[in-house]
């Protein structure tokens, strides 16, 4: 996808320049909403190997890459399984493994938990935290505010423009403004606001259940 106006640079490379497309695709990997649209093989490890093979990676290195990717995505024990037998969360982790086998610097998750049940979402979020700990940059596009609250940095977009930006605590302390953009806030932040309305003092940076419980414990001591 190319910009209709302006310029998009990926590590200094203009995405409009066709000479850069191969390098850009190696820098950034993408995981979509529906893993069934991203899985192409009949065996998990064959699917994870698909992208490195297309990139011309030597066979011996492909074996190393797919093993590392499956372990990092938490799907190694299912390496010989047929994808259609997996749960939604497991399929999404196969899709993630297939992308990180290309060893991109950045992974873009486009509503990657939207089609999953709560258990599947929890599986994928655990994998995202592991990838972040491994040094991979994660850009997650989501309407689930509980997921956004786990990020290092949050950007709110409206009509194609960034309208809010900051840490989760900075962004989710502005409940009314977020509601103005038709967005919810994490449940812990909603509870914080209701407690404040009831006359119970709560810090604005309370946006997670643990932080909320800690502040309530302080009040009860």
Give residue spans per PLM region.
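ABC ATPase NBD Q-loop/coupling interface
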Residues: 7-23
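Conserved catalytic motifs of ABC-family nucleotide-binding domains
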Residues: 103
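Conserved ABC ATPase "signature" region
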Residues: 60-78
């Amino acid at each position: 996808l190319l910009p209709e106006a302006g310029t998009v640079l990926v590590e200094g490379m203009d995405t409009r320049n066709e000479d850069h497309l191969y390098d850009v695709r190696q820098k950034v990997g993408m995981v979509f909403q529906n893993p069934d649209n991203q899985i192409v093989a009949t065996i998990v490890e064959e699917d994870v190997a698909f992208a490195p093979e297309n990139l011309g990676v030597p066979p011996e290195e492909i074996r190393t890459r797919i093993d590392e990717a499956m372990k990092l995505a938490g799907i190694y024990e299912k390496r010989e399984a047929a994808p259609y037998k997996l749960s939604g969360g497991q399929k999404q982790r196969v899709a993630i493994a297939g992308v990180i086998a290309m060893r991109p610097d950045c992974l873009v998750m486009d509503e990657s938990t939207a089609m999953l049940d709560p258990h599947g979402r929890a599986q994928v979020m655990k994998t995202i935290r592991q990838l972040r700990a491994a040094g991979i940059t994660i850009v997650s596009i989501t309407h689930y505010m509980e997921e956004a609250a786990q990020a290092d940095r949050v950007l709110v977009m409206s009509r194609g423009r960034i309208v809010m930006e900051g840490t989760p605590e900075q962004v989710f302390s502005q409940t009314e403004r977020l509601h103005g953009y038709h967005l919810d806030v994490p449940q812990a932040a909603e509870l914080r606001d209701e407690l404040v309305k009831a006359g119970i003092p709560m810090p604005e940076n309370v946006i997670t259940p643990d932080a909320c419980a800690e502040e309530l414990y302080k009040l009860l001591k």
